[in-house]
């Protein structure tokens, strides 16, 4: 709506050429074997005179045995299938400009004249190769009591070789990151889904489901030197999401307090301010939660129906820039002692000489105290566990008698709410799902907007 309007134009084009083959075998309709092979050529990894390969050949094999078709398992077991498989997956860079610099024009950059510039903030890498993921998986599909109860369990073990990521680059380079193949990341875990039909009559039905996943990750290798790889950092620059050999994926590696052997924070003798650990960072947590939980239930009574879905994660941590700023500026509830700021407060910990803290921090010094803690990443680390009502719906199926004489065969009206509220949330003042980067840099939050709560009306008509 402004008088002078500007515009921009960008052009992206990428292509994957593939050769694919598969074969399927069956034995007496209860044993099945499938094998595949595929070769992909990625345009995003292709460059004239490039020595590193731009393609990858990967295969897979899966075997399933429907034991309930060849064994008498009694009346209790309705269906039983065992499955196992090995698979490989390959991929290229997302951007078609990952291998070379791209240039653009910045309008009215100097005295009204256009200026040329380098587009993008990532240093290209001509030696990037396709990443590869290898996985072994075993599972069981069990259904019981005339399919009223089903259990689907899976164990997996995989490794990702040469993942294509943007690692942190020195600010003096003029770029924010550099493209690289990350060494070797392993993941193993279990997935469990249980479904049950609890009750069913002509007028009433009640179904429920529970799902659980747990993943164990490890950084097996990073680069040729085995050094740490930094992925991202908050604007406070006192912490980095770092891949460290032998540790779990996505370590929050940052500044911390000096502590005594008992774990108490050590404070300066002169003014009682906590002492930061100089010259060394440590692992303060891990941004990727290893465990996910879910519960769903649906009900039907005559023409009315309702459903609820509850989801949550546990075991992860998050660096909250929002809370770091609230503490620094005195807006966090922890900066207000029970007796008020005027009465001062006594920090938890010990003095440099090992003695207990007996004097309080007066109001005039409290600002200095909390401004010091802002520079220490450990202060803003929180557990990111949560459980929330992801979706709740209530619906009504309009009886066919009410639709007689109309052009509508079936009508359903539903009221649906998503992300309604938390049942539990271990973070202060933020939504743990509002981390500003959920990719290779999960675990960082910086004034992130919460996941929106939405309530809507859905009308479904069939003609």
Could you describe each region identified by the protein language model?
Residues 105-112, 257-268, 370-375:
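Short low-complexity stretches enriched in small and charged residues
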Residues 1-243, 295, 312, 376-463:
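Extracellular/periplasmic, surface-exposed regions of secreted and cell-surface proteins
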Residues 102, 133, 169, 174, ...:
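Short capping/connector residues at structural and topological boundaries
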Residues 286-321:
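Glycine-rich, aromatic-lined ligand/substrate-binding cores of catalytic
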Residues 180, 186, 197-287, 318, ...:
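Conserved small-residue
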Residues 42, 313-412, 417:
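Extracytoplasmic gating/loop element in the C-terminal half of outer-membrane beta-barrel translocons
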Residues 121, 278-279, 289-290, 377:
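Flexible glycine/proline-enriched surface loops and loop-helix/loop-strand junctions
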């Amino acid at each position: 709506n402004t008088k002078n309007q500007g515009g921009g134009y960008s052009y992206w084009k990428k292509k994957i050429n593939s050769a694919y083959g598969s074969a399927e075998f069956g034995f007496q309709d209860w044993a099945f074997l499938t094998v595949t092979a595929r070769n992909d050529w990625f345009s995003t990894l292709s460059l004239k005179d490039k020595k590193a390969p731009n393609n990858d050949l990967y295969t897979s094999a899966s075997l399933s045995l429907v034991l309930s078709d060849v064994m008498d398992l009694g009346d209790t077991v309705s269906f039983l299938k065992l499955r196992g498989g090995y698979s490989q997956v390959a991929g290229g860079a997302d951007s078609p400009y990952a291998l070379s610099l791209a240039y653009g024009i910045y309008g009215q950059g100097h005295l009204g004249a256009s200026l040329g510039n380098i587009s993008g903030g990532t240093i290209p890498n001509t030696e990037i190769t396709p990443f590869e993921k290898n996985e072994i998986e075993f599972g069981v599909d069990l259904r019981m009591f005339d399919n009223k109860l089903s259990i689907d369990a899976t164990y997996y073990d995989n490794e990702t070789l040469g993942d294509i990521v943007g690692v942190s680059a020195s600010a003096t380079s003029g770029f924010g990151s550099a493209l690289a193949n990350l060494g070797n990341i392993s993941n193993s875990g279990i997935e469990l889904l249980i479904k049950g039909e609890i009750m069913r009559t002509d007028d009433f039905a009640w179904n429920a489901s529970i799902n659980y996943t747990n993943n164990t990750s490890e950084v097996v290798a990073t680069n040729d030197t085995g050094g740490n790889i930094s992925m991202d950092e908050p604007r406070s620059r006192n912490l980095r999401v770092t891949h460290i050999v032998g540790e779990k994926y996505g370590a929050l590696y940052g500044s911390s307090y000096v502590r005594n052997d008992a774990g108490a924070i050590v404070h300066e003798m002169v003014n009682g301010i906590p002492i930061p650990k100089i010259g060394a960072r440590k692992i303060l947590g891990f941004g990727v939660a290893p465990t996910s939980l879910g519960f769903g239930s649906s009900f039907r009574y005559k023409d009315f129906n309702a459903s609820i879905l509850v989801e949550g994660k546990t075991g992860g941590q998050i660096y909250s820039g929002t809370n770091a700023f609230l503490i620094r500026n005195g807006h966090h509830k922890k900066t207000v002692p029970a007796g008020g700021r005027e009465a001062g407060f006594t920090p938890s910990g010990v003095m440099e000489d090992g003695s207990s803290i007996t004097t309080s921090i007066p109001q005039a010094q409290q600002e200095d105290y909390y401004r010091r803690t802002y520079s220490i990443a450990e202060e803003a680390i929180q557990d990111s566990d949560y459980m929330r009502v992801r979706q709740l719906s209530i619906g009504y199926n309009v009886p066919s008698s009410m639709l007689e004489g109309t052009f509508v065969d079936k009508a359903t009206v539903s009221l649906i709410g998503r992300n309604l509220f938390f049942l539990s949330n271990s973070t202060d003042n933020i939504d743990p799902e509002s981390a500003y980067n959920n990719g290779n840099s999960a675990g960082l939050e910086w004034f992130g907007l919460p996941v929106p709560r939405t309530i809507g009306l859905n009308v479904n008509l069939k003609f």
